[in-house]
């Protein structure tokens, strides 16, 4: 079996899925205490880096995604599939798991 090299440009989401680069989690508390990796909360904010073509409708057309590349989004805490590429973390989500676009 051949090894596959993954990068952001080689991952193309299908349907209504969205590929999001996860924002860095806080390294320390408001009081200045450094947090170990095990105590950090999973971030729920990230930047959209790839978008699928949209959800197929019954008539064969596609419903265009509401988010686009570059949008900063807030998503459900336990949604999606976590993917690590190099030192960066990503999550592959269904568009319905995105709660809001953050400005």
From Swiss-Prot:
Q: Which InterPro entries match?
A: Chaperonin_GroES, Chaperonin_GroES_sf, Chaprnonin_Cpn10_CS, GroES-like_sf
Q: Which UniProt keywords apply?
A: Chaperone, Cytoplasm
Q: Which GO biological process entries does UniProt record here?
A: chaperone cofactor-dependent protein refolding
GO molecular function term, any single one:
metal ion binding
Q: Where in the cell is it found?
A: Cytoplasm
One annotated Gene Ontology cellular component of this protein: cytoplasm
What Pfam families does this protein map onto? Cpn10 (PF00166)
Q: Which residues form a coiled coil?
A: none
Q: What does this protein do?
A: Together with the chaperonin GroEL, plays an essential role in assisting protein folding. The GroEL-GroES system forms a nano-cage that allows encapsulation of the non-native substrate proteins and provides a physical environment optimized to promote and accelerate protein folding. GroES binds to the apical surface of the GroEL ring, thereby capping the opening of the GroEL channel.
Q: Which family does the UniProt entry place this protein in?
A: Belongs to the GroES chaperonin family.
Q: How does it assemble?
A: Heptamer of 7 subunits arranged in a ring. Interacts with the chaperonin GroEL.
Q: What is this protein called?
A: Co-chaperonin GroES
Source organism of the structure: Synechococcus sp. (strain CC9902)
Q: Which lineage ranks, top first, belong to the organism behind this chain?
A: Bacteria, Bacillati, Cyanobacteriota, Cyanophyceae, Synechococcales
**Which gene codes for it?**
groES
